[in-house]
A protein has these predicted regions:
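Terminal amphipathic alpha-helical/low-complexity segments used for targeting or macromolecular assembly
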Residues: 1-53, 114, 120-121, 125-133, ...
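A generic "structured core" feature
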Residues: 161, 171-177
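Flexible, glycine/small-residue-enriched loop-and-beta-strand segment within the central core
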Residues: 58-72, 77-165, 191-192, 198-208
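Short, functionally important structural connectors and interaction interfaces within domains
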Residues: 34, 40-42, 52, 62-64, ...
């Protein structure tokens, strides 16, 4: 394999990290040492810890000062041009696609196992005061945290504001702005996001028809 081909292959993986676990043995022979080096360097520079069989693009930006650590669960993937600022906890088999932004504020972001965060999604776990009479930049910052459940899909360019919990198995549509909690199995869309249905085959809602 030529050096130029390998570099192109690395770039493809950086933007499409779901291809990493599908690599053929001859590609895995160079990709695994490469990833080991990338992850060890991040762990040396920041308070970041990776589980087993993770992928992180060299172009990803992870910032985790002491007290704002980032934990990445087994088999999770972080694509290129993402920005993650702790505190953040990613479960196992979590995928963060390119250009997503996760800002943990003080209270942090937690994402459950098997959840998918699509390209350009934005999660901000803090908010500014906005009282009239004072400059916004001089007002206190608050942080309640963001909780994303298990098997959740956050669509491309959606936004999740501070204090929101997205329940297990929920779907947030492309471009939605989520300002309140999302029940499990719900599908929400719009700005502000509102329920538009439930995932096909979802169990009945509690208290609903049986």
């Amino acid at each position: 394999m030529s050096d130029s081909y390998r570099e192109q292959h690395k770039l493809r993986l950086a933007y499409m990290p779901w291809l990493y676990p599908r690599l053929k043995p001859r590609h895995r022979a160079w990709a695994e040492p490469w990833q080991k080096k990338v992850q060890e360097e991040l762990e040396r520079l920041e308070t970041v810890r990776f589980g087993e069989h993770c992928f992180v693009a060299p172009q990803a930006r992870l910032f985790a000062e002491p007290g704002r650590d980032i934990r990445v669960g087994d088999h999770s993937h972080i694509a290129a041009d993402t920005v993650l600022h702790g505190p953040i906890r990613l479960g196992a088999h979590v995928s963060i696609n390119h250009h997503a932004t996760l800002e943990g504020g003080a209270a942090g972001i937690e994402i459950g196992d098997h959840s998918r965060i699509a390209a350009y999604a934005t999660l901000y776990a803090f908010n500014h005061g906005r009282e009239a009479g004072d400059l916004i930049r001089e007002q206190p910052v608050t942080s309640r945290g963001i909780r994303i459940g298990r098997d959740v899909w956050l669509g491309a360019r959606c936004g999740i504001v501070d204090g929101v919990t997205v329940g297990d198995h929920a779907v947030v549509a492309m471009g939605a702005v989520v300002t309140r909690d999302v029940p499990p199995w719900s599908v929400v869309a719009g700005n502000p996001a509102r329920p538009i249905g439930r995932r096909p085959g979802a169990p009945p809602e509690e208290g609903g028809e049986r």
